[in-house]
Regions:
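Primarily recognizes the serine-hydrolase "nucleophile elbow" in alpha/beta-hydrolase
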Residues: 1-43
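Juxtamembrane loop segments immediately following a transmembrane helix
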Residues: 40-41, 53, 64
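Short, hinge-like loop/turn segments at secondary-structure boundaries
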Residues: 40-44, 96-99
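C-terminal catalytic histidine-bearing segment of alpha/beta-hydrolase fold enzymes
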Residues: 62-112
Length: 112
């Protein structure tokens, strides 16, 4: 998901870890607090793609710091930075998401 969609993707994964093969979070963050599946995720460690611009003008430093701490402890994190994108998505990021989904979601055929 993008922005709030990324928050939703990770929040739903945190609520029902067994139902997710992977998650994508572009220019987003993880919600604060403890979710029912957080402990289980430390064992399952599903793949999560997190793409962003380090200078994103919308997502605050606290949310970025929380996400940077939480994701590596609860997932197989693939983290990418896209300088100059701002709070948006670039062609390079979409290409990286395509590769990530192709490698991590069995049977997935994302539209390219």
């Amino acid at each position: 998901g993008f922005s709030q969609g990324g928050v939703m993707a990770t929040s739903l994964m945190r609520a029902r870890p067994q139902q997710f093969a992977a998650a994508v979070n572009c220019s987003g963050f993880v919600a604060p607090g403890v979710f029912p599946g957080d402990a289980e995720l430390t064992e399952l460690r599903p793949p999560v793609f997190w793409g962003r611009d380090v200078a994103d003008p919308v997502i605050g430093a606290e949310a970025i710091a929380r996400t940077a701490e939480w994701l590596p402890a609860h997932s197989q994190l693939v983290s990418r930075e896209y300088p100059g994108v701002g709070h948006s998505v670039s062609r390079d990021e979409l290409d990286d998401v395509f590769v990530f989904l192709s490698q991590n979601v069995p049977g997935a055929l994302p539209i390219r």
